Every structure is written in structure tokens, then in C-alpha cells.
């Protein structure tokens, strides 16, 4: 069955300035800054939380539909995803706005000047999940990823109304949402995904206790960076899964999206919680070792070897068997 992934679709435009921003800023003129930097290069990466997760699920062989909003400039990105098995028929194309874009220039001190253009993402609120269900049938799971906040609320309510299982994954939007808004996204979720900082932020903003949250969801999935991930059930049963050791640390961007995609692909394929988290941890480390969130490569034999090294031959055999 299909996993429907809702959330942001974006492109990242990254540049490098071979000097120091600090040397160009004159204290006496900070009230009227007007600067232009000649950069060395420009690298464009495909991204957005929904784009990243849909890409990874497709690469792993899962059935996935991308549900989000993009601009007319989405054509190349669409072809890229379709080549990986992603159903892009439910991407709303804006008639007026470009695809969301993150632009960032980094200097030699790793200082950054960045901007984010939400663009077409603001139109995601116009997407109806009922239309997706009519076209592809009832999805196995709907991921409610970081997106236009109003779209997140509407998608969540529609999942409840239509009886669709959903995963709450507010991630970076937790910082801007109020406690009341966060509460609207949680109740009834099959999965609640956060990292450890976001979990504490969620509790702080909502005023809920852990018990309050666990009474409303089926499973809490909290990633812990280099310490792995905790899977917590309502009765307190906890499974901890460690990371797959990395060969290098290139860029952490998109690691959380990768884990979620691997974990949910495993669940969809019939794996248990622990094995699914182990698969998610492998996909996460592949992204960590790559430049760009969708530039990693999937190699069946290499995956089996790394899983065996991290979790043992038996675990590796169980995981790769469902991906064959």
C-alpha cells in the first residue's frame, strides 16, 4: 500500500564566498547595509521534507505518493522523483509562485547569510486528501510533515475525518507554532516523530506531560542524534536502537527525513519496530555521509554489510529480505 507524504517541497541554492562577511560590515553604516558578494560557486540541491522522504521511500522500493505544492519550475524535480518511483500526480502546481527556495551564502568562517522563500508552499492548504484517496485508494499512512501551517492543520483534520492513519512530524515548524496549534497536530497520530530537542519543546509549549502525549498516540519516535533513537509505546515499553557508524560526517541536513523514510518503509514492508529503526538508521547515515539530501546512493550488498556490522547478521538478513 502507498505512503502519502505531505510537507514542503523546496530547492536549496548554496553559494560560497571566499572572504569574511565581517570584514565587509562597517559599524558606522550598519543602519543602511547594501552589499553584494562575488561568490565562487553555486550548488543546487533538491529538498524539502516531503521531497526528501518521498525520494528515500522510492529509492528503497516503497510505494509513495508526494502530496505538496510547487511552482512551474518543478518539472526537472518531478522527473528526478518519478525516476525513483515517486508518484507526483498529487503535487499542486501554483500558477503564480515558484517552488519554495532556500538561498544561503557561506563565508570562510562558516558564517552564513540566508533567506527562505516559501512560494508555492503557501498554497498547500488548497490540497484535499480526499482527492488523493479517490485517485489511489486509501493510503496505508499519511505523513504530516513540516509545511504551510494551515495545510498541516487541514491535512491532520482530514485524516481524522476520513479515518486515515497518520504520522505527526512537525519538526522545524514546532519553533513557530503555539502550544494550542501543536495540540491540533498530535491527537490520534499513529506515530509522533521528533528529535530530542523538539520533544522537549513540544512538552514545554503544550504544557503536556509525557503521559498526556502518550495517551493520544500509538508510538513516540524520538531521534537522539549520535545516540540513536528511542521508540516508546503508550505503556512505557521502550526500544532503543543505536546508530550505524559513519565513515564520515559531510552534512547533517536531511538526516531526520532519511530516518523517517527508512523506518516507515520498513514498517510498510512488514518489519517490526526494531528492524525498521535499524533500516532508518542506515538511510540516515547514508545521507549524513553525502552532500545534499538526495545525493546518496543505495547499494544492496553494501547495505547488507553495514547493517550486519552495526546490528548483526541476523538483523541484516531480516531487513534486506523485505527489500529484495
From Swiss-Prot:
Its GO CC terms?
plasma membrane
Spell out the catalytic residues: 257 (proton acceptor)
Q: Which reaction does it catalyse?
A: adenosine + ATP = AMP + ADP + H(+); adenosine + GTP = GDP + AMP + H(+); dGTP + adenosine = dGDP + AMP + H(+)
- Its EC number is 2.7.1.20
Tell me where in this chain the PTM N-acetylthreonine is found. 2
Give the residues the record marks as binding substrate: 8, 12, 36, 48, 52, 102, 116, 172-173, 257
- Alphabetic keyword roster: Acetylation, ATP-binding, Kinase, Magnesium, Nucleotide-binding, Purine salvage, Transferase
Q: Carries keyword Disulfide bond?
A: no
Any one of the GO BP annotations:
AMP salvage
- Swiss-Prot/TrEMBL cofactor(s): Mg(2+)
| Top EC group | transferase
Q: What is this protein called?
A: Adenosine kinase
